[in-house]
Amino acid sequence: MNDMVCAGRVTSTHGVRGCVRFRSYMSVDFKFPGIDVSIGGVSYTVCGAFSRGFPMFVLTLSRVGSACEAEKLVGFDVFLSESLLPPLQVGEYYCKDLVGLAVYDLEECVGHVSMLYDFGAAAEVLEIVLLSGKKVMIPFTSAFVADIDLNKKRLAVVFPPEI
């Protein structure tokens, strides 16, 4: 499985038959059953999934038949093949494509994107490491992100006055 992307994280066990609770980083309508995933470097097939209220799901995995086996997976990220990702609409981006982009304020490079956070609020938050080494966070909204050019590997931002 090359070109793996993180789809979420196992947060706890569910029941006594080896199911796991999973916090998804995917879109609401992503279909998990039948896909192969990697957890802790081991491959599993998702045999079943049901929602516990997005973004939480309960997954049934191949070769995990008890709560003890499921417990060993808690805390691990769940990876899947990038080829399984759904196509994006105009103006949508995958987090993996934004991390590492150079950040520009007008025409001057001022740093790079180090992380994209989703704290469950109305908007995701970009963490930017400035050339000085200082880390700043701005909302990932059109009010602060003026342009994204993946071909040029750059993101133009409008910093609030206090930054």
Curated annotation (Swiss-Prot):
Subcellular location(s) per record: Cytoplasm
- Asked if the record carries the keyword Transferase, the reply is no
Q: What is its main location?
A: cytoplasm
Q: Output the Gene3D superfamilies linked to this UniProt entry.
A: PRC-barrel domain (2.30.30.240), RimM (2.40.30.60)
Gene Ontology biological process terms from the UniProt entry: ribosomal small subunit biogenesis; rRNA processing
UniProt cross-references to InterPro entries, sorted A to Z:
PRC_barrel-like_sf, PRC_RimM, RimM, RimM_N, RimM_N_sf, Transl_B-barrel_sf
Question: Which key words tag this protein in UniProt?
Answer: Chaperone, Cytoplasm, Ribosome biogenesis, rRNA processing
The PRC barrel domain, residue ranges: 90-155
Q: Does the keyword rRNA processing apply?
A: yes
Question: Which GO terms of the molecular function aspect are on file?
Answer: ribosome binding
* The organism's place on the tree of life at top rank: Bacteria
Q: Give Gene Ontology CC terms.
A: cytoplasm; ribosome
PANTHER family attached to this UniProt entry:
RIBOSOME MATURATION FACTOR RIMM
Q: Which family does it belong to?
A: Belongs to the RimM family.
Provide the assembly information: Binds ribosomal protein uS19.
What the protein does comes down to: An accessory protein needed during the final step in the assembly of 30S ribosomal subunit, possibly for assembly of the head region. Essential for efficient processing of 16S rRNA. May be needed both before and after RbfA during the maturation of 16S rRNA. It has affinity for free ribosomal 30S subunits but not for 70S ribosomes.
Domain notes from UniProt? The PRC barrel domain binds ribosomal protein uS19.
Q: What is this protein called?
A: Ribosome maturation factor RimM
Query: To which species is this protein native?
Result: Neorickettsia sennetsu (strain ATCC VR-367 / Miyayama) (Ehrlichia sennetsu)
Q: What is the lineage of its organism?
A: Bacteria, Pseudomonadati, Pseudomonadota, Alphaproteobacteria, Rickettsiales
